[in-house]
Structure formats: C-alpha cells, structure tokens
Amino acid sequence: MIKKFDKKDEESGSGSNPFQHLEKSAVLQEARIFNETPINPRRCLHILTKIIYLLNQGEHFGTTEATEAFFAMTRLFQSNDQTLRRMCYLTIKEMANISEDVIIVTSSLTKDMTGKEDVYRGPAIRALCRITDTTMLQAIERYMKQAIVDKVPSVSSSALVSSLHMVKMSFDVVKRWVNEAQEAASSDNIMVQYHALGLLYHLRKNDRLAVTKMLNKFTKSGLKSPFAYCMMIRIASKLLEETEGGHDSPLFDFIESCLRNKHEMVVYEAASAIVHMPNCTARELAPAVSVLQLFCSSPKAALRYAAVRTLNKVAMKHPSAVTACNLDLENLITDSNRSIATLAITTLLKTGSESSVDRLMKQISSFVSEISDEFKVVVVQAISALCQKYPRKHSVMMNFLSNMLRDDGGFEYKRAIVDCIISIIEENPESKETGLAHLCEFIEDCEHTVLATKILHLLGKEGPRTPTPSKYIRFIFNRVVLESEAVRAAAVSALAKFGAQNDDLLPSVLVLMQRCMMDSDDEVRDRATFYMNVLQQKQKALNAAYIFNGLSVSVLGLEKSLHQYTLEPSEKPFDMKTVPLATAPITEHKTEIAPVATSKLPEKLAPSRQDIYQEQLSAIPEFQGLGPLFKSSEPVQLTEAETEYVVRCIKHTFANHMIFQFDCTNTLNDQLLQKVLVQMEPSESYEVLHYVPAANLPYSQPGSCYSLVRLPEDDPTAVSCTFSCTMKYLVRDCDPNTGEPDDDGYDDEYVLEDLEVTVADHIQKVLKPNFAAAWDEVGDECEKEETFALATVRTLDEAVNNIVSFLGMQPCERSDKVPENKNSHVLFLAGVFRGGHDVLVRARLALADGVTIQVTVRSTDDNVVDVILASVG
C-alpha cells in the first residue's frame, strides 16, 4: 500500500511524500475500520487524510464506493475527538458532490452548529451549507440568521462566507438575511466586518443606488477593519468607472481620504485605485504618487516592491507625474531585492532624460543575469518604450539587447527581445543592418520555431532592400539544411523574396530552390516548386502577387468558403472574391505590460471580429444572399453617455448593400421596450429595404435591431450619405423590483444623432509589405493624379493622419510615420474597394504655407479612382 523507501530514495528526495503511491482500492478497504468499536481516532484520522489526498489529486471515486465510504465516515460523529471531528467536516465538504444521500449528516451538523463547543460550530456551518440545496435551505434559515450575529467571530464569519457562496444558488432566500448582515457589519472583529461588507455588496451589486447608499453609510460611520476599507475602495472605484465620475465626486473624495488611513494596506489600496482610474489627470494622481514615494523608503520589502511596481505602471501613461520620485527610485537601484531594483530601473528608463540612458543601461547590465525571466521581459519592454522616446540612443540599446539575446532564457524572454529589435529596425532605418546581423546570429542557434520563422520572414522582407543582400543568403539557406520542417518552409519563402527583388541573385536563388525541391517534407517541396516556377517567369506582376504580397483574405473565411465549395460540386472554378478580406493587423504599441504567458503551445487561430459578424448576420433569414461581408466599421455612438437609452451603430458593408446594426441598451428600470427598430431617412439615393426589430429590450440587457439598405446602382461614385435616425418602440411600464411589465403599452420614439456613411466605409484596409511591387502589379491603366492644398493644416503629421483616417486605407512601408525636421514626405496607402477592386494611393506632401498634396491613385477600376479623388477634393 505505502511503499517502503530505501536509503537511495531518501537521498534523492523522492521519498518526501508518504502518500505518493497510495491505491484507492486499498484506502477504501482500510475505511472499514470506521465501523469498528471502540473508534480509534488516530487511525481513522490517518485514513481520512488519505481519502482527502486522493480526492485532491484528481482520483475518480465511483458513486457507489464514495457513498459507502461516506456512510462509514458518518459513524465517526460518535467520537468526541476534536481533530477527528474537524477532519470529518472537511471530508463531508470534499465528498458532497460525489456521494449520494449526503443529507443524512444534516442532523449531526445542525447539532454541532447549535451546540456549546465553539470549535465545532464554524466548521459545522461551512460543511452544512456545502451539502444544503435550495429545498433544504429554509429549514436551516433560522440557524443561519442566528449564526451571522453570533458573538463568536469564527462562527459569524463562517456563516457570512457560507451565505456568500449560497447567493449563487438561492439569492432570494439569502437576501432575507440582510438585516443580520448589517448588524454583523458593525462588529468590532475585523474579519467579521469584512465578510459582512462582502455579503452586503453581493446582495446589492445589481442596484447601483443601493450600493451608493451603503458606501455613504459606512464612510460616515467609519470602519474598524482594514480589509473592509480595501473592499470599500474597490467598490467605490468600480462605481466611479461605471458612472464616469471625476475628481469632484464624493466617491473620489472617499478614496483620497483613505490615503491618510493608519493602515498601510488601506493607503496602498487607495493609491493603487487612483492610479488605475481611466482618464486620471496629473493633478488627481499627485497625492497617490506622493504616498507611493514615501513607501519607496519603507524598511519593508513588500511595501517598497508594491510602490515601485505601481509607479512603474504610472510611468507608462504619466511619466512626468513620476519624475518627482526619481531620486527615491535611484536609491532603489542598489536594493538587495533584485525585483525591486529591476522595477526601479525600468521606471527610471521611462521617466529619465536622454543623458541618463547610458548610465542606467550600465547599471542594468551589472545584475540582469541574476533576475528571473519575468523581470527580464519587463526590462526589455522598458527599453522598447525608451527607443521610441529617444530614437538616437538605438545603438546603445541594440548592443545591450544583442548581449541579452546571447544569454540563457525562456521563450517569452527571447520573444520580447526579438520583438524589441524588430521595432528598433522599423523605427530607425539606419539601424537595420546592425539589427538584422544580430538576428541572423541568433537564428544560428535558436531552439524556438516561432522565433526562427518570424526572423526569417523579416529577413525576406528587409534583407533584399539592404546594400548587400547576398550576405543574408547563407544564414537563410543554413536553416534549410539544419532546421525543422516549419523553419525550412519559412526559409524557402524568404529565399524567394531575394530572388524576386534582386536580378543579380536570381540565378543563385534558383539553384538553391532546386535543392529545396528534393526536401523530405511536402510543404517545403511544394513551396520550392511553386516559387521556382514563378521566379522563372521573370514577371514583376507575378512576383508581386505571389511572392511579395500574397493573399489578403480571412483564413477562417477561406476555410469555410472552400468547405462550402466542396459540399456543392460545381463546374465553375472557385472564386476568391467570395472570401471575406482579412482585416489589417493593429500595430499600435500597447501602453501596459501584458502578463507573461506560461504556455508554449501554439494558439488556436481565433476568429476575427469580422468573422464573428459574418456568422451572426448570415443566421438572420432577411440577410440571406447578400454575399460575403466586405467590411464592418467600428461602433459609432448615436446617443450621449448619460441618456435613458444608449444606442451605437456598426456599419456592415456588402457588395451592393449595407446593414446597419444598432446595439441598444435600455437604462430605465421601470420600462420594458418591445418591437424596437431604428427608422432611417437617407439624404442621397440610398434605399432602405428592410427593418429587423429587436423583440424585447429589458432594463440593462443589450439588444440589437438591424436596417438593410441598398447602395445606389445608377451612380457608383455616390458613396457618401447622411441618415437621420429615429428609434421607434412600444413601451410597457414595469415594476422596478420584479421586472413584471404592465399588460398595456404605448408607442413612442426617440430621436438619435445623424449617421454618416463615408468613403472609408467602402474600403477595406489591406497591408502590402512591398508597395512598389504592388504599384507595378496594378499598373497605370486606371491611374489619375490631382493636386490639393490644405490651407488649415500646419504640419505634415496632421495631414498624414487626416488622409489615413478619412480614406480608411492601410499605410504601407511605415509611411504614416513622418521623419523629424522634414518639409516633404511620401505616404503610401493600400486597400480594396467594395466589389473586390484593388486601390493604391501615393500622396506626396510638401510643407509651405499649409500643406500641398499631390495624390496619385491606381486601381483596377476607373470608377474607384474617381471616387477616391472626388472624396479627397
């Protein structure tokens, strides 16, 4: 049963767990000892420990065997041994879901719960509530009410916490105990007060007014429990976030007053709450930052760590607010706790001046090898932010990152470094060759397939444009010889890009491709054969379409369309235009540190927002036969934030139609809305075909209604339109407490903001990694050029942002970033116009008195070119 360990096992440490080799059948056999008389508490205790151990290890107990063991265990209530009795309570809780007829112990537990032994009463309450269902709850309601207000803190806390668990099961019954919970909230015991506040909040959390009243009551009367204060701060900050209240709110005043509390945990909780408030100004942050600054010099390591970690987060959005703490943070660089020292340095990197960068980097180098991977990632993210702030310091950063790349470390750490180097390369063209050289060195000995393929993709994209592209060929082909199938396939794709862009390298690349065609893996052979045939044609249009820019369709959409095509055999070839386009990737930098993922498994391809919309809309019968969804806009608010109804609109564009999805929320708890629709009146030749109303709109439960509109067929250039919108509905008054509506109702309407349809709603962003190749591929058959003057625009940055947002196209080659101190700039934009027509825009901008723009548009359709130029004009 329990293996006897020899000396070797003891020395290796494998014998440290005496329950390691337990067998369920043997333990259940031993459980028969429970039926013996007299009861042996020590032996029974040991067997119960084994049963609980097996249950917690995930061992499966059949219903019959679990029930038999449970019934045998109930005999142990005859013993008066305190430890054995409390072990019985634990076993009851563990076996409550797997045994039958567990309610047979109800009388024993009720007896202990109401008995004189205080040591039994709390655990008995917890065990009883674990086995009680909704039908039995009323039978113990009287005992629970008494226990909540009991003078013994452990009993009261047990009853309160058990009540909190039962709220999910029987909310209406537990709600009747609110008076007792309020009495417990005035207890002198800090844990009882905390648990009582928690129960009161969960009973009232769906009623904002009741929660506000509760907060006002306790802020006036005061609390003795620091835990309760922390919960109050969290509730107050949640309310502030929901109501979008500012620093003039009484709730904010309460949180700020907690900064002067005598308990450190309350002070920190208040500071943390203020720091994490959205749209918090520097003035509102100041008192919280002052408190955190004091904590930086605390003798307690936990407080120093909490302070510097929170200041680190503040520095991401408000670096100037943390500048006052720089001296305190400098002192923490030499802290004996490496985690604190790391956070101090990364915070200084965000708040420090350009002149302090070199010194800080040297200090990090002295101990970076001693800290964990998690904190190394934090350091790398701080360096990445610093590179954007001080681009001239990229050489110092690059050397530091290359040294870190050579050190040992896990996948997340290495990925953070690679991402940082790639961002430096993209932001600073002069650092490209140095960065690529470091990455080439890294993939020579890289055990992470994901990183190797990512770097090979970057080499294929950036390498051919460097002055000496041939030097990268060796590193890439080494991957074909030495690596796994996925890396070999990525290397073949990278090689093809060198051959397509550099005529001098083409013969050498073709020789290497021939070798790759002999590979043992299907994917590698197929890619090599495909690229070989494309490259041999020596046609720029083919290279652009099949090597540089590739497909720009949704992968999930392609999979579904192909599956549908195979289910319905057809003589016609598969049409790629039936597949929804992929939405362009979001490349903006995150402002917050993401938690380090522990999983190294490849993530399953998640459906995009547009894939989800496509599925939702295709399920509505009125929208059948519209074809693939072309584009979905971001939500547009049609009401103010604090109005009785909140309405936002998402515009879904198809080839010849638009669907307007109105997401409506009713914020009045005394009304039920029915047959809700938004009536639309267009200003142009758009035609409203059909309305799909929302059947019911109860209080605080969002619902959607739809309007189907046909686009103008006679004038393809008529893309812009303004709709006046009115929400129409049937109102039925209802009881705010029960939600029961009246039998009768009346029609009403609510005027919404006007809704604009612009040229951006007809264009889907598509990223072209190689814009020049795409420009040649489209050709100049449908090309037009015009010059415009923007008299009111004063900077190139502003002009670029205006053009990008207005046209709704994807900036390529990072041309949306205007270099400093430049008077001219070229912006490249790519997209697909509704109907599947490629459209490319090259805008040459010059700064003089205002900004002058020369716009050149190429497309596969003349009408699209006219639409773009007309909209810009």
Curated annotation (Swiss-Prot):
Q: Which organism is it from?
A: Danio rerio (Zebrafish)
Q: How does it assemble?
A: Oligomeric complex.
Q: What is the taxonomic lineage of the source species?
A: Eukaryota, Metazoa, Chordata, Craniata, Vertebrata
Q: What is this protein called?
A: Coatomer subunit gamma-2
One GO BP: organelle transport along microtubule
Per the UniProt record, one Pfam family is Adaptin_N
| Entry keyword annotation includes Cell cycle | no
Report each HEAT repeat as a residue range. Answer: 64-101, 283-320, 321-355, 356-392, 395-430, 467-504
Chain intervals for the UniProt region annotation (Disordered): 1-21
- State the UniProt keywords alphabetically: Cytoplasm, Cytoplasmic vesicle, ER-Golgi transport, Golgi apparatus, Membrane, Protein transport, Repeat, Transport
Q: Kindly report the protein's main subcellular placement as a broad class.
A: cytoplasm
Topological type in the membrane: Peripheral membrane protein
Question: Which family, according to the similarity comment?
Answer: Belongs to the COPG family.
